[in-house]
Amino acid sequence: MSLALSGRDLLSVADLGRDEIDAVLDLAVRAKQGGDLGTPLRGLNMALIFQRPSNRTRVSFEVAINRLGGHPIALFGDEIRLGERETASDIARILDRYADGVIARLVSQRDLVAIAAAVRGPVISAMTDAEHPCQLLADLMTVREVTGRIAGARVVYIGDGNNVCTSWLYAAAICGVDLRIVSPPGYEPQESVLDRAARLRSNGTGFSVGHDPAPALRDAEIVYTDVWTSMGQEAEQQRRREDFGHLQVNERLLALAPPGARVMHCLPAHRGEEITDSVLDSARSVVFDQAENRLWAQMALLALVFDGVAERNPLPLEASS
């Protein structure tokens, strides 16, 4: 395996280059096709911090760690009470004495950075309010399965400028995806995010941000949506329903896209809100393939990041008599 990612943190999609993303995806495809990735996590203990609830994230990471020979140890918000009972840095310094790496699903990107600064082993983001890099690896894998490529793939993201949207902007800039973001006025990605994505752009393929879905969908290959109200925004739910209502991914909206366009959603879905049952459960939906790809993408990422870590931290030899 390539050592380019060995021992590295993944806090943002922007931490990766195009070649590194391709290496993860190539290995993920190999794993999905039944290839043996070995046991690069043999003898390693992995601390999983879940400040927020998870379903796909926890299960996919735990299965991936087990398959690679490691041992996952999950800690939940009510146990660690990050920022209340202890600081992120103090928690990290203790976990660093027990575990060989940390996978963290947190509210704050600042806390994630603090943990990474205090832990000697690799730290992987399993989501913050700012970004969702592992989701994007699975998404890019799915796009490649559907379109046969990543560079130049025409992806329409319908939603607000949330963490997934931010990671999509960075990934699109790095990989050359033709990304079109459609949001109601006032819900666009932050200017700082757009500026950073523009700096990451490595070729002529650009991204656009607009309010009208029709021109964006005209030649779309992927129609991607996400919840209108993310965790922590519950007080805004009714207003968001009103503002986003015309952007529901239903059969009427999907008719604006070519017949071959496929639908993606990072889940969980609010059925009947941002997407209808008839679309989510249709032959045009690859949503559950996309969810499955979380396992393969994260398994590949772990195999590359922890490649050689066990050798650098060998098991102690038995004492001689």
What feature does the model see in each segment?
Residues A198-S278:
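Rossmann-like adenosine-cofactor binding region
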Residues M1-V59, V63, E131, P316:
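Positively charged, low-complexity intrinsically disordered leader regions
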Residues P122-M127, L179-R180, A283-F288:
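Short hydrophobic/aromatic-enriched beta-strand-loop microsegments
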Residues G35, T39-R144, R271:
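Phosphate/diphosphate ligand-binding glycine-rich loop within oxidoreductases
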Residues Q51-A64, T147-T225:
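Glycine-rich phosphate/diphosphate-binding loop of Rossmann-like nucleotide-binding domains
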Residues P40-M46, A151-A153, G260:
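Phosphate-coordination loops involved in phosphoryl transfer and adenosine-cofactor binding
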